[in-house]
């Protein structure tokens, strides 16, 4: 119901299709791609934003964030024509570039995502296809961990805001703008990159 409501809200600015698939279940990522290709007449761009957010559960994190992501991407590549407009974008995380306690599984699979896309970018370049990662930092949105912290844990919220050079957190729209740029022909010579959208939070680190 929530997905249908969101799709209806978004449809005011264009055509929106919605579909439910479990990226951790074998066959479902490919099935989703088949459905999407049928609905839209093919696949030119795929954005993989899947994440189990499974805490310390390595098995679940790998099943969704790595194996599910790879299945989604590989199925999409089979539907892509060989031309410069096609590209793959995976949503990574600043966590792949920094050390933080209690997120080893999440950070590990996001680091693996960056490495996988660098490799993929070399595999598909001759087809004219690009592959990149967009890695958000701390992003605030309704229902998210930082949205809850702002409401319920003032000390944690103040600390996380002070850690960012801009003294604020990012928004989903700021991440989406970067994804839209990477998906467009304006970034036609960008591939194999990991673009951080973190307000400079990692700028003082050697990575």
Locate the predicted segments by residue:
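Substrate-binding pocket helix/loop in short-chain dehydrogenase/reductase
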Residues: 57-62, 160
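Active-site helix of classical SDR
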Residues: 73, 109, 117
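Alpha-helical segment proximal to the catalytic Tyr-Lys
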Residues: 78, 122-123, 188
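Residue(s) in the substrate-gating loop at a strand-loop-helix junction
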Residues: 93
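Short, small/polar-rich loop/turn modules that mediate ligand/substrate recognition or access, typified
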Residues: 125, 130, 190-192
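A glycine/serine/threonine-rich, flexible loop-to-helix segment
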Residues: 126, 136-163, 204-207
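Short C-terminal tail/terminal secondary-structure segment
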Residues: 180, 191-207
């Amino acid at each position: 119901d929530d997905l249908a409501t969101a799709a209806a809200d978004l449809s005011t600015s264009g055509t929106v299709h919605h579909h439910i698939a479990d990226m951790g279940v074998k066959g479902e990522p490919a099935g989703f791609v088949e459905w999407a290709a049928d609905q839209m007449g093919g696949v030119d761009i795929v954005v993989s934003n899947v994440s189990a957010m499974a805490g310390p559960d390595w098995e679940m994190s790998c099943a969704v964030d790595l194996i599910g992501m790879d299945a989604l991407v590989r199925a999409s590549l089979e539907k892509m024509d060989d031309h410069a407009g096609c590209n793959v974008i995976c949503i990574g995380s600043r966590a792949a570039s920094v050390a933080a306690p209690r997120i080893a599984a999440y950070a590990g699979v996001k680091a693996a995502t960056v490495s996988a896309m660098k490799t993929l970018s070399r595999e598909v370049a001759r087809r004219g296809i690009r592959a990149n990662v967009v890695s958000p930092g701390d992003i605030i949105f309704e229902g998210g961990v930082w949205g809850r912290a702002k409401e319920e844990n003032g000390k944690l919220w103040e600390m996380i805001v002070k850690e960012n050079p801009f003294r604020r957190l990012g928004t989903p729209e700021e991440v989406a703008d970067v994804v839209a740029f990477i998906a467009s022909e304006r970034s036609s010579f960008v591939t194999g990159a990991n673009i951080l959208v973190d307000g400079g939070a990692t700028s003082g680190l050697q990575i």
